[in-house]
Amino acid sequence: MVDSYDDSLDTGEKSKSQVKRELHALVDLGERLTTLKPDLQAKLPLTDALRRALADAPKHTANIARKRHLQFIGKLMRDQDTDAILTLLDQLDASTRQYNERFHNLERWRDRLIAGDDAVLEKFVVDYPDADRQQLRSLIRQAQHEVAQNKPPASSRKIFKYIRELDETQRGLR
């Protein structure tokens, strides 16, 4: 007797394991949505029932209650366009990463300006032509004086604020 597998009999239905994996992915996505702030949740295309469930999520603090509520959110996620939600979440994550990267870059500028010499200041003025060189030199001197006397870094904060304002103006965010 010859046993052979006939591909024509494959109906294209998902296996039970595949369905379970997809449902677990929906629960994981729902858990990710619960960590978002309400203003970010408002940007996502969600049903009212899912919005209410996400708003109720912080109320469930016991482990079993939280797990049960996440299962409920996963059930509600079945009716959602998860591809659109994932796309928007990825955009939000990317914008957050870009913001953090820009923030760290501005911090590095501040630190180099305080520790550096005129060459660093000239490079900064080339990168940010709207910078007021005199004001920046004054803030740098104050910050260096504060560091020398172990005072709180008030001028350092002012430099960062000034640099951030210049950056936002240059990027058209102001």
UniProtKB/Swiss-Prot annotation:
Organism superkingdom: Bacteria
One GO CC term on file: cytosol
Gene Ontology molecular function: ribosome binding; rRNA binding
Keyword rRNA-binding: yes
GO biological process entries: assembly of large subunit precursor of preribosome
Family designation: Belongs to the DarP family.
Role noted for this protein: Member of a network of 50S ribosomal subunit biogenesis factors which assembles along the 30S-50S interface, preventing incorrect 23S rRNA structures from forming. Promotes peptidyl transferase center (PTC) maturation.
PANTHER family per record: UPF0307 PROTEIN YJGA (PTHR38101:SF1)
UniProt protein name: Dual-action ribosomal maturation protein DarP
Gene: darP
